[in-house]
Amino acid sequence: MKLFTDIISNDEMCSDGYEMKLVEDVVYEVDAAKIVVSDGDVDIGANPSAEEAAEALENGAEQVINIVHSFRLQSTQFDKKSYLAYLKGYMKSVKAKLAESNPDRVPAFEKGAAAFAKKIVGSFNDWEFFTGESMDPEGMVALLNYREDGVTPYLVFWKDGLRETKI
């Protein structure tokens, strides 16, 4: 199993225990699911029936996104202007780290990141934003959106902002 941590904050962001797809060689799209949790519950990956989910919610449980819950990602807010200001600084930090570790990757990162950033801005109101557990303002902000069905959540993580560790 591989664990992916933010190269800036060192927060654990996701793992390959979830279905991951590399998109345009710049971001990972990671399929998520809504789960119901209550105090003391542990997510073992089972999919409860709708009746069980409704019953659990009646007993004070809450519905959460599995990856957000498992990696203790923290919800944060941006307007378009503040997100673009954050993204500019974040991309500069990632580029600097990349220049040290893999300088040949820098041009592809810059081109891919700029193109994907345009997609984010084009559908800005569809996205939700999450930081790592430490809430480091310099660290990665993961993006949450929903598939075309309007029900299935997925998260987007910047490929070059993650460090892969085998566990």
UniProtKB/Swiss-Prot annotation:
Keyword Protein biosynthesis: yes
SUPFAM superfamilies (UniProt xref): Mss4-like
A GO cellular-component term linked to this record: microtubule
UniProt domain TCTP: residue ranges: 1-167
Keyword Lyase appears in the UniProt entry: no
One of the Pfam families matching this protein, by short name: TCTP
Domain of life, per lineage: Eukaryota
Annotated GO MF terms: calcium ion binding
InterPro entries in UniProt: Mss4-like_sf, Mss4/transl-control_tumour, TCTP, Translation_control_tumour_CS, Translational_control_tumour_p
Stored PROSITE patterns: TCTP_1, TCTP_2, TCTP_3
Compartment(s) of residence: Cytoplasm, Cytoskeleton
Gene3D superfamilies assigned: Metal Binding Protein, Guanine Nucleotide Exchange Factor, Chain A
GO biological process: translation
Keyword line: Cytoplasm, Cytoskeleton, Microtubule, Protein biosynthesis
Function recorded in the entry: Involved in protein synthesis. Involved in microtubule stabilization.
Similarity section: Belongs to the TCTP family.
Name of protein: Translationally-controlled tumor protein homolog
